[in-house]
Amino acid sequence: MKTIVITLFILTYVIMLTLPKYRQYAAAAVAVVMVILGVVSPLEAVNAIDWNVIMMLAGTMGTVYLCIESKMPAMVRDMLVNKLKSVKLIFVALALFSGFVSAFIDNVATVLMVAPIALAIAKKFNVSPVNTVLTVAVSSNLQGAATLVGDTTSILLAGYAGMDFMDFFVIDGKPGMFWVVQAGAVATIPILFWIFRKEKNRIETTEITKVTDFMPTYALLATVISLVIASFIPNKPALTNGLICVFFFIAVLRYEVGRDEPVATGHDAVLAIDFDTLLLLSGLFVIIQAVTNVGLIDDISNAFVNMAGDNLFKIYTILVWFSVLVSAFIDNIPYVATMLPVVSGISAQLGLDPTLLYFGLLAGATLGGNITPVGASANIAAGGILKKEGYEISAGQFMRIGVPFTLVAVVAGYVLIWLIYA
């Protein structure tokens, strides 16, 4: 059975990488096969799906759509154009802005909020939106490790290691993960300029678009503020963030439907939710559960421990780069959850403070997702946004941006974490 599961797992990712148009159907079909084979029970499959993530996606997609229809992104676009007057500078600024926002809210939510601005600018000046939307996604993934609330993997680490919000800024008198990530972000700025090197257009001052209704923007801001506040609440229900996003979407939708001149109809707002992306993620959650059930992730972890021995630098190096490699192809959440006890055990055996290995794991697992279009939920969301605009993104297209961005950011973080904590 284990061989069958591994074969199906590999087949799924091959299809997703080579036939991106059908990836959601491949993931869903293989997930169903896993249930039929008995690798995952029907109840376990339902529980394996992270409904919090699904609800966050659906709610944010709906609210962002209404915000777009209210012309708020268009207004921001025009303000950026008038301020920077260069397509290259605007696209670089959007990527950096995406990273900043993502340090405090979910990566996927960040992409859903910032990508529409990138699309609006690309459409206005008749340039391809592919590079700018993808850099928004990879920048959001980079900064997700900066704070406790930036990414699910950070939350997993903090919960396991007993860290609080401020430990990501200063821990044991040393700079925390936040500053490591900022160093990585600074290192990627030349990469961003290289990606947009051909965008040499100078832009004339443009008339600023008027927003037709500010309520969707208020709903979006309320969503962000509520997510940040919720991050400080201990022992909150698992669905809290998802319920927040869905609540504000339903609230603003109800408000718009009741207006004489709504920014969009309720029907259009619901259809704006990217159900292909939701199906893809749901299938992946079940597949990863199946792979975990047959012990594949445990086998990989044990092999890692046997290979590393007791050389700290070797352990750290293998941990970081192995995490980058694994997270390029599978969701980093189950990987990090599995590796945290392994890292803790290694540290205990060597009598070391585990902070070095904890942050090495987080850096590698978070940034590794930027290598492939299926390595992180934010990448999948970005691909879904571009697909709706008529752009099918191949693995090669994504990797031309993701690989150099990842290598520069990981090397910077890898060196700095070692210098600070070793």
Regions found by a protein language model. Give the residues of each.
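Helix-loop-helix module between adjacent transmembrane segments
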Residues: 61-65, 85, 97-107, 138-147, ...
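Hydrophobic transmembrane alpha-helices of multi-pass small-molecule transporters
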Residues: 1-68, 173-302, 400-422
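Membrane-core helix-loop-helix motifs of multi-pass transport proteins
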Residues: 125-217, 353, 380-415
